[in-house]
Amino acid sequence: LKKDLDQVIALLAEELRNPLFDAKEFENLKQQFIGNTQQDLNDPGERGSIALSQAIYPKGNPNYSLSVEDNIANIKNATLDEVKAFHKKYFGTASMRLVIVGDTDGANLNASLKKSFKNWNGGVTEKLKFEEASKAAAKTELVTIPEKPSAELFVGQFTGLKRADADYIPFYIGNYTLGAGFAGRLMQ
């Protein structure tokens, strides 16, 4: 990457600024996404995660997960014109965050980025407004997947913490360390 950095960054900038938006490729990708999403119908982990997020978060919250069926419907209904409009509104240096990891030189990288992305304005940043989660009554939900020999257990609780709260990051790390996945200490 180091020796080809200018060329790689220039190609990246070109692809981000001027994507092809090929109609046939768009339809192929939609079918691929639908196929991948349909597999979630038989995935206990995915179905459990969706059920838990729906139990904790209201529909207007970004942490709320749509059902697999709703995701498939959204993919089917998506249009290339909507994708083009989204790109036009949101893509640009005003809202872009670029992370490059590897054997690179910061000064050369910065110069290459400035050269390749100069004169590209646009991209809006919007303050997201969404419905906050609130405490709800305890609930047990069973998600049945016929003929599935495995089962998964999901446990969640409303904490009232918001991302901006000082305790959010320590709580997040503690939660992950104790029980988020098979690496968690509660699974040992």
Language-model features, listed with the residues they occupy:
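Charge-rich, well-structured scaffold segments of protease-associated domains
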Residues: 1-125
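Phosphate-proximal small/polar/acidic motifs at interfaces that engage nucleotide phosphates
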Residues: 187-188
